[in-house]
Amino acid sequence: MASIDRHSAIPLYYQLKVWFRQQIESGALRPGDQLPTEAELCDELGISRAPVRQAMAELARDGLIYRRAGAGSFVAPAAAAALIQRTTLRVQAHYDVRWMDSLEQATQRWNAQHPEHEVDLDVRMCTRSEFHQVLQRAAIRGEAPDLAAMDYVWLTHYATQGYITPLDELDARWVAQTAQDLEPPVLRNNTVEGRLYGIPIQADITGLWYRKDWFEGEGLKPPETWDAWLSVFDHFAEPEVMARYGHHYSLILPMTATTGETTTNLLIPFIWMVGADVLNAQGNLALDTHFSELCDMLRFLQTITLDRRDHMPKDVHRSNWWHLARYFAQGDVPMTLGGSYEWPRIREESNWNDETDAAAHLGFMLLPRPSRSVQPVGSLGGTSWAIFQQSEHRDLALELLKLIATRDASRQFCEENLQVSPYVSVNQRFMRAEHPWLQDLVPLLAYVRNRPMHPNYVRISGFIQDMFERVLWEGADPEAAVRKAVQALTVVMAEPY
């Protein structure tokens, strides 16, 4: 029977889908074989219906199984053979594969439109921490994949190193038309030296998730300021309130390098909201330009991570980035730092299924700030598809990206996953009453900023993570930690790239 790893970063539905696909490819499941029912899989695996239902739907969409009303799901005739007689595109992925659905749906549409030139995807996965090393080694050996999906902030490195293709090189007119509809901060993150390198799947906004239903039950408003945030934190730490809702902690947030880029992405708005920055507009080091304000901000965060540590999970320093949403989804905390990208994982780990559920029970806001006079700010994130220069199928890969970039495809993907679209025209359609969650989320895009777009960003981010870990977890003096980070970043900025 299928097995899943609940501690893996790979989404539950994807683990289940891959397992059945492998069974079909190997012949262990033959055409006509009946699959277990959704209820049976839920009972055996100990998971909710949402990931099981999604796995079955995608297997059916890919033509590997079919459903018979009242009878169940069965392996489709000649399913294994259909996987073999196709042009293969190699795809490099890390374990956060939710965006893979965009490519898989585009591949399905392509195959339906071009039965004489069908495509199959050979997806190789690695951990997020191994991702860059795997890609660079493959490129050095001349074995780079055709396609890879990567965080916006990684594109600058791969573009300046010549690993990925400027898309206007393949179809300048289509690229120009697509760029016109991209949200401005998304366009900035996908453009290097005036050329578009990535086709974005969604746009992420960082902020604070909170239990809207619990807040309303307690007569509390979402905390806009640091003082209000501490007050709400302490309220949910009161024994009688904890007994009322059954939670164990008040808040979870990343504070060590264990959560990797998530730490930088979620915490960098605190740097911005006090007037500081990592790099200035000219790309020069700027972390020490608002030194005293930066240190004051770190001291404030210490009032949470040090003074109130008993009301946070004891293993938070060892938690991986995907654990943050799990605590929240399972009702262990009323608040967690996170990104708008968390909804699919929250849905998997909870009994909430759709946009109506999200709007009724949950809230998402930009991070609390020093005072209301300070403008709210969030960090922009997202995932983009990029085509590698070594690919022998660059034109074919671009055709798939064109299908991903259609506004209908973007709308469908973002509606299903409750994500902000990278396209202005799609987001305008979400500003309607039938989208109670997205119509509140999309306006936050006006307040986002881009993380540093620098070829050495991965190393720069590593030292920012180290600074936060030393201060928030180890209790280091903020002034000493900032000075150490500035010294390290000065060396990094002087290195060639």
Residue ranges and their predicted role:
Residues 197-201, 230-286:
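Extracytoplasmic/periplasmic solute-binding protein
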Residues 307-309, 348-418:
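Extracytoplasmic/periplasmic substrate-recognition and gating elements
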Residues 1-44:
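Extreme N-terminal segment that seeds HTH/winged-HTH DNA-binding domains in transcriptional regulators
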Residues 359, 365, 414-463, 470:
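Long, aromatic- and glycine/proline-rich binding clefts that accommodate carbohydrate-like moieties
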